[in-house]
């Protein structure tokens, strides 16, 4: 529950030929911390991701109550499959309400096309692999671990600094868990 008993959801926009590997670690962090993750698509139902997996999304984007969204996540891939006004309009509404919006690889292109990257630092205009500026996180495909960690930090998913450092050591530095 968020402030005032408001239900909050972390929404992941999936689509045919999206790159699921770019968001697998982030989804793990969300689920492991009890977050209410909703997989949506333009039309509810089965999508086939770039890696060949079939995923059944539980909601169409048009059915998402944007006032209950804590974060909105867009992986990269063939973004022509989400090049629709409903996506851009939803992003603008979420952005204006301060919702965390995260796009990796071509997902960041969608944020740019929606006009959300004007006047902020992003992986689209900078030489950085992963950038957080206010309520927007963007990353290049190779930065999927940094993307997951930065988004998790923005959502306050880590118990404390030690939890964060253990996560970095395990996922980014490939050190064994103690």
Model-based region annotation:
Residues 9-18, 24, 28-45, 53-178:
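Active-site-adjacent pocket-lining segments in enzyme domains
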Residues 49:
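Acidic surface patches and DE-rich sequence motifs
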